[in-house]
Amino acid sequence: MATVLLALLVYLGALVDAYPIKPEAPGEDAFLG
């Protein structure tokens, strides 16, 4: 079970690195500005 969780963490990490899109920052900047 631990192996599956570790694989999921690595997979999600790869997705985040592949798509460094953070909708929170632009949204906050647009709202504040």
Swiss-Prot record:
Top-level taxon in the UniProt lineage: Eukaryota
Organism from which the protein derives: Homo sapiens (Human)
Keyword terms of this UniProt record: Secreted, Signal
Range of residues in the leader sequence: 1-18
Family classification: Belongs to the NPY family.
Gene Ontology cellular component terms for the protein in this record: extracellular region
Tissues with expression: Expressed mainly in the testis and prostate.
Chief place of localization: secreted
The encoding gene: PYY2
Protein name stated in the entry: Putative peptide YY-2
Lineage, opening ranks: Eukaryota, Metazoa, Chordata, Craniata, Vertebrata
Subcellular locations according to the entry: Secreted
